[in-house]
């Protein structure tokens, strides 16, 4: 029995050390981007964190922040074969941000207006750098541009809904 406990303790220490080492390595390498092998783990963590937020304002800020990260990712991935995947994750993040903002009180939407404007400017900048998707998948690219314009119209004139 003693041998079992010593083995279990050794395995536990090994797992903790491996976890710490992996965390330090990932933290040192910067945030992951769509197309990276471990990006789905980061995506899962972001989604899980969003589900734990209990206020509508907090959730909206969280998902706007994630959409901002995806917009930056899109710009840094421009010119690679991962553009389409990055657009997919950006599209998902925009949908989540829009739903989260819609759940807030109408009077609280002003809190997010500047963040949303900054987000849309970042997306426009990143989209202008794309070179693969506009040629290989013009419908996807045009859909992204249409979504940006639609969200911009909602920000400029929220009463038009």
Listing of model-derived features with the role each one plays in the protein:
Residues 1-161:
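Long, charged/polar, soluble alpha-helical segments
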């Amino acid at each position: 029995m003693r041998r079992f406990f010593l083995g279990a303790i050794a395995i536990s220490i090994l797992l903790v050390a491996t976890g710490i080492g992996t965390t330090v390595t990932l933290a040192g390498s910067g945030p992951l981007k769509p197309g990276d092998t471990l990006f789905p783990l980061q995506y899962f963590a972001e989604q899980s964190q969003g589900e734990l937020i209990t206020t509508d304002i907090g959730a909206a800020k969280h998902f706007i922040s994630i959409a901002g990260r995806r917009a930056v990712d899109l710009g840094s991935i421009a010119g690679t074969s991962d553009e389409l995947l990055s657009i997919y994750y950006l599209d998902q993040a925009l949908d989540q941000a829009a739903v989260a903002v819609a759940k807030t009180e109408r009077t609280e939407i002003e809190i997010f207006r500047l963040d949303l404007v900054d987000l849309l400017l970042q997306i426009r900048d990143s989209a202008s750098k794309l070179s693969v998707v506009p040629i290989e998948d013009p419908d996807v690219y045009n859909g992204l541009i249409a979504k940006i314009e639609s969200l911009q119209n909602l920000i400029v004139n929220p009463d038009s809904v």
